[in-house]
Amino acid sequence: MNRKDEHVSLAKAFHSKQKNEFDTVRIVHNPLPEVSMSEIDLHTTVAGLTLDYPLYINAMTGGSEKTKKINHDLAMIAKETNLMIATGSVSAALKDSALSDSYTIMRDVYPEGKILANVGAGTSLARAKEAIELFQADALQLHLNAPQELVMPEGDRDFSNWKELIKEISEGISVPLIVKEVGFGMTRETIDELAELGVQTIDISGRSGTSFTQIENARRKKRELDYLVDWGQSTVTSLLEANEAQHQV
């Protein structure tokens, strides 16, 4: 089975309503709101892109015929709701152009939409530009996924040049850059480091959704790394970590 299809199959198998730390968060009530509902405007800006509301469809999949259908359907949803959307990692298409249409289908379906390309942090500037040009992406997501790579049987084991590559991409592309986590959360120290590299937009996606350590461990013959299934910080913890760095990014 294609690895991308395997990821989707396992994500479905492991999908469940997990406990979420947002359930423990209580919003402080304001007894004196002094606002009219007609004055409320949900428009916001992410990475210089204006959105109708603070919501978008994040990176999921691509790289096979089955995932092409998923991306087609996601793009249809994005078009009908006027949402920004990101492709899954386009690394498969950069290695094999025959797989490109599983990503470009999003632009075919949603030509006027805001669509983000997605590549890993170990990607060169030249490859990053290829990813952007593949379907004229409006911005580039650069994902950090070291835990996934370490658990993945065929994953990368060398992350020593990530910061160098991130800086090159930050300085060398003509569209906005978003550095994102893939469900392991973010720390204040990492946010500080990324800001020093010129990164202005950071997606702090934390634990409680799809677990790529769980998915990759299920692909291992012995499944011996199950203790890493819940690795990382939650999004709530990551938000607290990010709070002190708001002035930087």
Name what the model sees in each region.
Residues 1-47, 51:
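An N-cap/entry alpha-helix motif that binds or orients negatively charged groups
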Residues 41-43, 101, 124-128:
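Short alpha-helical segments and helix-capping/turn motifs at coil-helix boundaries
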Residues 45-92:
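Active-site cofactor/substrate anionic-group-binding motifs, chiefly glycine-
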Residues 75-80, 111-116, 121-249:
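Alpha/beta enzyme core
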